[in-house]
Amino acid sequence: MILADVLADYEKQLEAVGEEPEALSFVYRGLKQWDLTHFVLQLRQEVSEEDAELLAHVFSQLKNHKPAQYILGYEVFHGLRFQVDERVLIPRPETEELVDLILAENPSTDFKVLDIGTGSGAISVSLKKSRLLWQVTASDLSVDALELAKENAKLNQVDISFVQSDVFENISGSFDIIVSNPPYISENDKDEVGVNVLASEPKMALFADEEGLAIYRQIIEEADKYLTPSGKLYFEIGYKQGQDLKGLLSLHFPDKRVRVLKDQFGQDRMVVMDDEK
C-alpha cells in the first residue's frame, strides 16, 4: 500500500475518536526527519514493512490520546527546540506571544529576571537566548520539571540559575522582571480541556484552586519583596481571568499601571504590571 492510502485510513480513525488527523503526518515526518517536499514525494511510494510498523505504533499512541509532541519528544518554541515529555506541559504559541512582548518592552541588557513555574524552561531559555546579558533565574515546584528544564538550557546553550521552589519559598534577591505562566485552569473548567491534555500532561501544571487564581494570588501578595522599585510583572492567564487579575494587582499595587492584553486569537491572555502609569 502506498503512504498516502495508509495515512488516509489511519486519519479517518483518528478523526472518529476526536483526535487531529494531521497529527499522524506531523509525527511521522518528524521521526523520519523529512522536510515537507520530501514527504510529498514519498506519498505515492509503497510503505516498507519497517515504516508500516512505525506508522501503526504512532497511530496507536495518538488514538490513545498521547500528544504528538510527546511522541516526537520535542516542541519548537520561539525558534528553539525544547525536549518535552510527561514531566512538563507542552509549550503553546500563546506563550511565545508573552516572550515576544517581554523582549519588545525591555531592550535593556542588564536585567535580572525570575520565571516562576518554568516547566520545560520555554520562557526562561527563550528570554536568555535573546538577551544573553540578562541574569535569568527559573523556578519550579517540580524537581522532575526542573531536570528537563536544565537539559533544555544545556541544549540551547544558555546559562540559567534553576531553583526548586514553591513560588518565592527558596528565592532571594530582587528582580527587574518577574514572569509566570502558572497553573491557571479551574476544576470547574475541566470540560474545556482537550482529552489528550487531560490524559498526558501533568495535572499540577494545569489546575489551580480559587477558580484558577491561587498561584497568581501567591505571587501578587509577595511580589513587592522581590521586585526592584521599577520592576514589572508579566503573567500568562486564562481567557476569563483578565479582569480578576487586574483587580488583584491594582489592589496590591495602586500606583502601578496594569494592562490586560489579548492573544492572536482575540482572547485575554496576558496581564502586565509596570511603572508607566
Q: Which residues are covered by each model-predicted region?
A:
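Short loop/edge segments at beta-strand edges and connector loops
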Residues: 72, 163-165, 262
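Active-site beta-alpha loop architecture of Rossmann-like, nucleotide-cofactor-dependent enzymes
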Residues: 69, 185-188, 240
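Conserved SAM/SAH cofactor-binding pocket of Class I
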Residues: 97-192
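Non-catalytic accessory regions of SAM-dependent methyltransferases
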Residues: 1-47
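Mobile active-site "lid"/loop adjacent to the S-adenosyl-L-methionine
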Residues: 184-215
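Conserved AdoMet
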Residues: 30-104
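Conserved Class I SAM-dependent methyltransferase catalytic core
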Residues: 210-274
